[in-house]
Amino acid sequence: MKNIYPQKKVGLYTPYLDVLGGGEKHILSIIKVFEDLGLALYIFWDKDLKKEIKERLGLTFKNLFFLPNIFKKKSFLSFLKFLLISKNFDYFFYVTDGSYFFSSAKKNFVFAMAPDRNLYRLNFINRLKLLNWQFISNSSFTHKWLKKWGINSYVISPYIEEKFFKLKKQKKETIILSVGRFFGHLHSKRQDLAIKTFKKIKQKNLSFKDFKLILIGGLKKEDRDYFSYLQKIAAGDPSIIFETNLSQEKIYDFYQKTSFFWHFAGFGIDENKNPQNVEHLGIAPLEAMACGCLTFCYKAGGPKILIEDGKTGFLFSTEDELINKMENIIANKKKQNEIKKNAHHFVLTNFSYEVFKQRVKKLIIKI
């Protein structure tokens, strides 16, 4: 692509870069738009992660460089050093961990990945530091909470990969799918409730006797105890299947053949007290909707904003409400097709890469 902004530079620091999860893909995708416009990218991190970023996140950079991580000590000297270095950047992005600093870059952005009050306690000194910064939020839900805390932000939601919108002409199978990392802390995906609800609906209604529950998610060593607990409550039921650390291509294949998608993240949590512990956006439900799965989400956080109950998917507040809605829709093929069509159109209209790219470009023009 033609270099529209010759010699301009973009900087990034995120203390979470070693995670390389959805949040990291989001912020890296944002700066990738800048690279495509001809800008050079610089990340403050001691290790060159281009290979890992390509393998794990599917993002390839041609003009990305890594600089020594001067932030890791969080000393006065390191922040002073950054103040001198940052004048070389036209744009600088920072994923906050609750700390803030002065920057002499021309334009500065705090990227807000979660509506956690502890990350945005802006005392007088922090407000001084942020006089030349603008906030970007990852979802309408995060934006709403930042606004409640007196912070204005510009929403740039992540995008859904183009392949998810290309529906394969294959018959949907008797599968209920849940996708999300296996862990029992913070905003857990609550696969335990999916298992219990699945057992309950199979016992109650013969229409679901041939269904399988497939639980897909990333699994780390430190989360093995929670995973073992899930296997225990599944109690050897052969219709409950666990799939760990699958490639994106294999996950995509499951979406394509799945009939129903369940998402329990945030279940039982009061989002008005702990908004950080419910689903902030809900990428997996959006992927499911794009792939023609009838999607059911716990009524909190991002999904509550995104899904129009009974039109683009379904929301539930209790396990029994989920079961009732499943029973009501299982035999109504006409309604199923109508909802699938609406959901696919909604995601395509609001979460395609083209929509994402234009949001980022508007940010550049805006500033």
Can you say where each PLM-predicted feature lies in the sequence?
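Acidic donor-binding loop of glycosyltransferase active sites
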Residues: 256-280, 293
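Nucleotide-activated donor-binding/catalytic signature segment of Leloir-type glycosyltransferases, i.e.
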Residues: 227-252
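Conserved acidic donor-binding segment of nucleotide-sugar-dependent glycosyltransferases
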Residues: 308-310, 314-320, 328-334
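Short hydrophobic beta-strand element within catalytic cores of glycosyltransferases
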Residues: 285-297
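Conserved donor-binding/catalytic core segment of Leloir-type glycosyltransferases
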Residues: 168-189, 195-200, 214
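Donor nucleotide-sugar binding/catalytic pocket of nucleotide-sugar-dependent glycosyltransferases
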Residues: 132-166
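A short, well-ordered alpha-helix in the C-terminal region of glycosyltransferases
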Residues: 328, 335-350, 356-362
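Active-site donor-binding segments of glycosyltransferases and PAPS-dependent sulfotransferases
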Residues: 40-99
